[in-house]
Design a protein with these regions (language model features):
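ATP-dependent small-molecule kinase phosphotransfer cores
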Residues: 1-41, 45
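Structural motif
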Residues: 15, 56-57
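Short, surface-exposed loop/helix-turn segments at secondary-structure junctions
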Residues: 39-49, 79-85
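NTP-dependent small-molecule kinase module
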Residues: 72-124
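Conserved phosphate-donor/acceptor-positioning beta-strand/loop module used by diverse small-molecule
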Residues: 25-31, 47-50, 57-77
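Alpha-helix capping and helix-coil boundary motifs
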Residues: 43-46, 70, 111-112
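Short, well-ordered alpha-helix to beta-strand connector turns
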Residues: 19-20, 61, 101
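A generic local structural motif
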Residues: 9-12, 50-54, 91-92
Length: 124
């Protein structure tokens, strides 16, 4: 965990030097924690000191999104998840993350255009 934490601190320093208005990271702090929680079966990872510490890395003006989909759609789209022993645990952790007040939930059951519009409404 400590190595991932340090790696993310370095990544944050790189991001803060950029001059663009938005930086989009597909996988970052929450994904690292959920991967760790799923692989090590740490059910309370999102309520842990590590969650709090990792979130100190995130700049204060950051929007955090979680894109949700129906579990059957995910399993049909990525068949490897059907045999992944961590999948259900990871899926449950993402659902827990979606209930956090600092996370914006994007419903991805419709078109990609619909998902993009949901994000734009939040950041504008």
């Amino acid at each position: 965990i400590l190595c991932s934490y340090i790696d993310n601190i370095i990544a944050k320093r790189k991001v803060t030097k950029l001059t663009s208005d938005f930086v989009i990271c597909d996988r970052w702090v929450n994904d690292i924690l959920i991967d760790l929680g799923a692989e090590c079966r740490i059910n309370n990872i999102l309520e842990s000191k590590w969650y709090d510490r990792f979130h100190t890395i995130i700049p204060s003006n950051t929007f955090q999104f979680i894109v949700i989909r129906n579990i059957d759609d995910i399993l049909n789209c990525r068949v490897e998840n059907n045999t992944n022993p961590d999948f259900q645990y990871r899926f449950d952790l993402y659902n827990k993350l979606a209930s956090k007040s600092n996370v914006h939930v994007i419903d991805n059951t419709g078109s990609i255009e619909n998902s993009v519009m949901q994000i734009l409404r939040i950041i504008e």
